[in-house]
């Protein structure tokens, strides 16, 4: 077939596809007018930097996993709070029936505006999540947790019955349905997951996550959250030092790590992250126990510097802006700043 004939045949095929499936169903990559990946801040600038784009990507699936009480739900709730602060709508599928509204409120979540569902079965949870995403109105949805998404057959069966692979099949089907809807609506879906140990593993890590392998494939970002140290005020434990490893990242280089403080009852210490990152990148100067910024003293000791920044939010915002500018992290866009390219589902 001659070159002109091939071009004409291709144009006819593209016109037919656009007519049948809608404009934009097929396009040349150079003609793609989609904006750069937008992000929802996590509440920790260290984690935002590790993610490479300033937060959790919009329109993607995120998996947050780790041991018990490591800070998984706290990270997710901070993302919810930041999405709401930008004018977005958030939903929380509480499959564990363990959401604490008071704690969520302390992290900045607008509990009056948060959509919450406590489903009876895994099928119900994922169907509700899918319907909310397809509405196109959500900015972020959290499913807590994958391990608690119990298939209906298991709930209705006897205690000793075997239900091999039911949850994995349920997750695989749900993620196949949701992926395109998430991209179309710009909704970020966070799946919180638990760790299990594989029996008989001689080499490598025996740890694995629940719900089969589908979530590992469909997730654009996977975060491994670990508690590495207990923060103490004298002899009293006041929080945890947390390390997050970005074990998978489809929107930026993976395998970066971030460390930050989680204060009991207060969540991620934003000011603590600013101090750590500011010192690391030469924006805040540390001399002995004193912290200074632009010639002004922030305080003696990290706790005093943290309190000073908490009392002076404009200064904290200025430091955050300088850190992001130095590291080339663009400011996160608000949910309605750029509309996603419509895709027929």
UniProtKB/Swiss-Prot annotation:
Pfam families attached to this UniProt entry: RecA, RecA_C
Keywords: ATP-binding, Cytoplasm, DNA damage, DNA recombination, DNA repair, DNA-binding, Nucleotide-binding, SOS response
UniProt subcellular location: Cytoplasm
UniProt-recorded Gene Ontology molecular function terms: ATP binding; ATP hydrolysis activity; ATP-dependent DNA damage sensor activity; damaged DNA binding; single-stranded DNA binding
SUPFAM superfamilies registered for this protein in UniProt: P-loop containing nucleoside triphosphate hydrolases, RecA protein, C-terminal domain
Chain sites annotated for binding ATP: 66-73
Any single GO CC term annotated in Swiss-Prot or TrEMBL for this entry: cytosol
InterPro entries the record matches: AAA+_ATPase (IPR003593), DNA_recomb/repair_RecA (IPR013765), DNA_recomb/repair_RecA_CS (IPR020584), P-loop_NTPase (IPR027417), RecA-like_C (IPR049261), RecA-like_N (IPR049428), RecA_ATP-bd (IPR020588), RecA_C_sf (IPR023400)
PANTHER family tied to this protein: MITOCHONDRIAL DNA REPAIR PROTEIN RECA HOMOLOG-RELATED, RECA
Function (record text): Can catalyze the hydrolysis of ATP in the presence of single-stranded DNA, the ATP-dependent uptake of single-stranded DNA by duplex DNA, and the ATP-dependent hybridization of homologous single-stranded DNAs. It interacts with LexA causing its activation and leading to its autocatalytic cleavage.
UniProt name for this protein: Protein RecA
Gene that this polypeptide is encoded by: recA
């Amino acid at each position: 077939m001659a070159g002109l004939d091939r071009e004409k045949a291709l144009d006819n095929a593209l016109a037919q596809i656009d007519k049948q499936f809608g404009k934009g169903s097929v396009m040349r990559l150079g003609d793609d007018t989609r904006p750069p990946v937008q992000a929802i801040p996590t509440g920790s600038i260290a984690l935002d930097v590790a993610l490479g784009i300033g937060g959790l990507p919009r329109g993607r699936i995120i998996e947050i996993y780790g041991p018990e009480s490591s800070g998984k739900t706290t990270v997710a709730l901070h993302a919810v709070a930041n999405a709401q602060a930008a004018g977005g709508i958030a939903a929380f599928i509480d499959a564990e029936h363990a959401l604490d509204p008071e704690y969520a409120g302390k992290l900045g979540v607008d509990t009056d505006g948060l959509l919450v569902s406590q489903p009876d079965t895994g099928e119900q949870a994922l169907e509700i999540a899918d319907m909310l995403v397809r509405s196109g109105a959500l900015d972020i949805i959290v499913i807590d947790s994958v391990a608690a998404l119990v298939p209906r057959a298991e709930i209705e069966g006897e205690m000793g019955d075997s239900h091999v692979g039911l949850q994995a099949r349920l997750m695989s089907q749900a993620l196949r349905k949701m992926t395109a809807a998430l991209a179309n609506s710009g909704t970020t879906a966070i799946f919180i997951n638990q760790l299990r140990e594989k029996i008989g593993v001689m080499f490598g890590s025996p740890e694995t996550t629940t719900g089969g392998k589908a979530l590992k494939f469909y997730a654009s970002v996977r975060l491994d959250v670990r508690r590495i140290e207990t923060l103490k005020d004298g002899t009293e434990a006041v929080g945890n030092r947390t390390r997050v490893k970005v074990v998978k990242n489809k929107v930026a280089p993976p395998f970066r790590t971030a460390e930050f403080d989680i204060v009991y009852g207060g969540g991620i210490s934003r000011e603590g992250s600013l101090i750590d990152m500011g010192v690391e990148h030469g924006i805040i100067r540390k001399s002995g126990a004193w912290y200074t910024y632009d010639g002004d003293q922030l305080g003696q000791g990290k706790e005093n510097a943290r309190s000073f920044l908490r009392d002076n939010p404009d200064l904290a915002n200025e430091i955050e802006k300088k850190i992001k500018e130095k590291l080339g992290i663009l400011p996160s866009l608000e949910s309605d700043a750029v509309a996603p390219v419509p895709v027929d589902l």
